Amino acid sequence: MELAQSSPDETDSVIVDDAAFEGAAHPLFSRMPSSVSFNKLRKRLLRQVRQALDDFGMLKGSRRWLVGVSGGKDSYSLLALLMDLQWRGLLPVELVACNLDQGQPNFPKHVLPDYLRSIGVKHRIEYRDTYSIVKEKVPAGATYCSLCSRLRRGNLYRIGREEGCDALVLGHHREDILETFFMNFFHGGRLASMPAKLLNDEGDLTVLRPLAYAAEDDLAKFAAAMEFPIIPCDLCGSQDGLERNAMKAMLADIERRMPGRKDTMLRALGHVNASHLLDPKLFDFQSLSPEPKE
């Protein structure tokens, strides 16, 4: 799809209300249910993505995005929502979908190419056998996630540069952000999570997470209704006892006992009061000055 040229200021923010999500959707939504409940879900997710784009300035200076598509529910949903926003004129960037085939056993090599062709999105399928590297390097009994993620991210950065993209767009959602926060809190002794927007170490690509406000349950319902051809992860997904699963179970229990607390926790990550914490690098407790120490 050719995009109209626009000035940088024009792509920084687009004022949107619910009326913008009415009317004909992208053709890929022709398979979507016509139910009122699904329409509400679709509009809620579109609204949350647009809110994240605006809140974190994701459109600032952007022209071409590499969208990581793993074959899971989150990345499929992300791509569909971005394509719909683009179709409606609310996302003035070019999208390039990318799947990194990491050489996992029984990975169905035809599924993603066939699907991406069918929805008419520019895409690239890249093969890199990081599976063998992970199996060789990670000790028996240890989890693969960290090394697998680093190898995948490095390859996606490379592909993004080769494709002339200025951003790498990933499908992490609300629960991913909260789970990462509590993993750092309990095991790293620090307050940190996944940022919605991050400049990579080389300074040439921005990492974006437009699903930052989206609930995993909503994405699961959306993906099921859209009948995306889900590909399970036979590497990381086959491992039991991952620490992230413990955080997921803890958060699910909190939400069950106190509904709405996940949204409250997510809001808390955006309302940090440095003077009421214990980090002298963020607040000068010696002089009680709001300016951090040099």
UniProtKB/Swiss-Prot annotation:
Enzyme Commission number(s): 2.8.1.-
Gene Ontology cellular component list: cytoplasm
Pfam families in the cross-refs: ATP_bind_3
Principal location listed in the UniProt entry: cytoplasm
CDD domains: TtcA-like
Pathway(s) this gene product operates in, as recorded in its UniProt entry: tRNA modification
Catalytic EC class: transferase
One biological process term in Gene Ontology: tRNA thio-modification
Catalytic activity: cytidine(32) in tRNA + S-sulfanyl-L-cysteinyl-[cysteine desulfurase] + AH2 + ATP = 2-thiocytidine(32) in tRNA + L-cysteinyl-[cysteine desulfurase] + A + AMP + diphosphate + H(+)
Subcellular location: Cytoplasm
Top-level taxon of origin: Bacteria
Motif PP-loop motif location, chain numbering: 70-75
InterPro entries: Rossmann-like_a/b/a_fold, TilS/TtcA_N, tRNA_Cyd_32_2_STrfase, tRNA_thiolation_TtcA_Ctu1
Record keyword RNA-binding present: yes
Keyword Iron set for record: yes
Misc: The thiolation reaction likely consists of two steps: a first activation step by ATP to form an adenylated intermediate of the target base of tRNA, and a second nucleophilic substitution step of the sulfur (S) atom supplied by the hydrosulfide attached to the Fe-S cluster.
Complex formation: Homodimer.
Function: Catalyzes the ATP-dependent 2-thiolation of cytidine in position 32 of tRNA, to form 2-thiocytidine (s(2)C32). The sulfur atoms are provided by the cysteine/cysteine desulfurase (IscS) system.
Entry protein name: tRNA-cytidine(32) 2-sulfurtransferase
Organism: Rhizobium meliloti (strain 1021)
